[in-house]
A protein has these predicted regions:
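Alpha-helical transmembrane segments of multi-pass membrane transport and lipid-handling proteins
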Residues: 88-140, 170-178, 226
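Hydrophobic/aromatic end-of-helix segments at the C-terminal termini of transmembrane alpha-helices
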Residues: 31-36, 40, 50, 66, ...
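Short runs within selected transmembrane alpha-helices of multi-pass transporters and secretion channels
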Residues: 1, 21, 25-29, 52, ...
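Interfacial/gating helices of multi-pass transporter permease domains
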Residues: 10-14, 18, 34-56, 85-87, ...
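Alpha-helical transmembrane segments and their helix-entry boundary regions
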Residues: 34, 45-46, 158-159, 185-186, ...
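Helix-loop junctions and terminal segments of transmembrane helices
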Residues: 51, 55-99, 146-151
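Alpha-helical transmembrane segments of polytopic membrane transporters and translocases
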Residues: 17, 32-34, 46-63, 93-97, ...
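Interhelical loop/hinge segments that connect adjacent transmembrane helices in multipass membrane
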Residues: 1-30, 69-86, 206-220
Length: 226
């Protein structure tokens, strides 16, 4: 096999895009911890940290599994429109089939799970955990869209969606501060992620070969069942 500088440059662009998006994501999420730590007692920060940590364990693991599974598969078909569409739609259905019911179950069973693991020590974290799990579902769906974008080598678009996500997160932080509660801050994260998801769907439909109605048809049944 011959060395290809064009392939190397493409790989570097994708890698740099993923790295930049990770930095942006870490910065925006740490902003919430920083602000809560300044404005609220340490006990309140502890409640938020517990809810955030346990919610991340679920959606971060799912996102990683889906990304490592579907990115190589979809990348194989980036030059074959029909096969890419079939593979993308199937990957979207698999993602929704797993992520939607898991998230729904965690939200419904949040109180029993926390009581089983911690007794009543972290009861204040339960409502925050439920909101963050709902947000986590959106993050998984956003990550799946980004996987499809990356599979086509559109690293610039991918970084663009991450910038939009982090700008909305920071904007939601400042918009929810006047409400004076950590729960309001967490709801801000949820609505920022909802807006991000709408934007990412728009970008995904533009850069891939899947139509909006096809995308919605693949996900809606699982969302409604959840």
């Amino acid at each position: 096999a011959r060395f290809s500088s064009a392939s190397l440059r493409a790989m570097l662009r994708v890698g740099a895009g993923v790295f930049a998006s990770c930095l942006l994501n870490v910065g925006s999420l740490n902003a919430y911890t920083f602000v809560i730590g300044i404005l609220y007692p340490m006990a309140t920060l502890g409640v938020y940290t517990q809810a955030d940590k346990w919610s991340k364990m679920g959606y971060a693991s799912l996102s990683q599994i889906f990304n490592t599974t579907f990115l190589p598969l979809l990348s194989r078909f980036q030059e074959e429109k029909e096969r890419f569409v079939r593979a993308m739609r199937k990957s979207n259905r698999v993602t929704a089939f797993i992520a939607c019911p898991v998230s729904g179950a965690l939200i419904v069973m949040a109180a029993p799970i926390f009581h089983l693991l911690f007794g009543s020590k972290w009861d204040e974290a339960i409502p925050l955990f439920q909101i963050l799990v709902a947000r986590g579902l959106l993050i998984v769906l956003i990550a799946q869209c980004n996987t499809c974008i990356l599979a086509l080598g559109k690293a610039g678009r991918f970084v663009g969606t991450e910038v939009v996500k982090d700008v909305l997160m920071v904007g939601a932080l400042f918009a929810s501060l006047p409400f004076g509660s950590v729960e309001a801050l967490v709801w801000g994260q949820f609505f920022a992620s909802l807006l991000t998801y709408a934007y990412v769907i728009y970008i995904t439909v533009r850069v891939t070969f899947v139509r909006l109605l096809q995308y919605l048809a693949d996900l809606t049944p699982y969302l409604l069942l959840t």
